Regions:
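N-terminal amphipathic alpha-helix/helix-capping segment at the start of soluble metabolic enzymes
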Residues: 1-50
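Acidic (Asp/Glu)-rich catalytic clusters
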Residues: 28-30, 52-63, 80-94, 120-127, ...
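Active-site mouth loops of central-metabolism enzymes
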Residues: 32-51, 103-114, 160-171
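Cofactor- and metal-binding active-site motifs of prokaryotic enzymes
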Residues: 102-120, 225-234
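Catalytic alpha/beta core domains of metabolic enzymes, predominantly
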Residues: 136-234
Length: 234
């Protein structure tokens, strides 16, 4: 892979040369083969080193078995400075970094709204990441401030929404994607918890419609053990 974590933040933000594509740290989503994103959920510096070493040993379609590292900052110990941890991660992971802080509202850790904003902006401006994840349905002005700040730093933005209790109707999914698109995100992401075949069909329909409506790259993720059992029954 030509893009390294340490240079990813210097790449320009782009929606890709083809409708439905997006460039994150030099890796184009929606073009060519399926891209592999591997999470780092380290609490300590030692765990950062250990997890990135494990990623490097993976087999797969690229030399390291992955295309992008998703750094889950909400797993990091409060005693460790996030930017120092990012330096360590960028030095050891020769891949573009997608930086994510998942808040308690969407299955992660509690954080004050101002601290969430300041952290994402600092990470985006660090020159060490290719993209940041922004929870799209927080305060609208804060979301736009984060997206604008990231773009000014040359960093792509993944707008996300998570519902771990149900599957929204297709109309709601498309409305949420529309709001993410209007806010200027480069990638639109929605994750939910299907409980039936009907739920899976809703997600397939919404995915198909989104691919025809939006120029941005849109992703829908299904979580939970029920998804696997439903697919087996199909």
């Amino acid at each position: 892979m030509s893009s390294s974590a340490s240079s990813a933040g210097k790449s320009s933000v782009s929606s890709g040369s083809v409708k439905g594509t997006a460039a994150l740290g030099g890796v184009v989503l929606g073009e060519g083969r399926t891209k592999v994103i591997v999470p780092v959920t380290a609490e300590t510096f030692d765990e950062i080193a250990g997890q990135t070493a494990s990623i490097a040993k993976l087999g797969g379609q690229t030399a390291s078995g992955a295309d992008i590292v998703e750094w889950r900052m909400d797993f990091l110990s409060p005693s460790i400075d996030a930017l120092t941890a990012l330096e360590r991660l960028a030095d050891s992971a020769d891949l573009p970094i997608l930086a994510t802080f998942r808040t308690a509202d969407e299955g992660g850790k509690a954080i004050e709204a101002s601290a969430y904003r300041d952290l994402l902006l600092a990470v985006a401006r660090s020159g060490k990441v290719g993209a940041i994840d922004v929870e799209a349905f927080r305060d609208e002005s804060t979301v736009r401030e984060i997206i604008d700040g990231a773009h000014e730093a040359g960093v792509a933005v993944v707008a996300s929404y998570h519902d771990f209790h149900a599957t929204p109707a297709a109309e709601e999914i498309l409305a949420r994607f529309g709001a993410m698109d209007a806010a200027g995100a480069d990638v639109l992401k929605l994750a939910c918890m299907p409980a039936s075949v009907d739920d899976l069909l809703v997600l397939l329909s919404a995915t198909h419609q989104a691919s025809r409506i939006f120029d941005r790259r849109a992703f829908i993720f299904q979580h939970g053990p029920s998804c696997e059992s439903i697919c087996k029954r199909i």
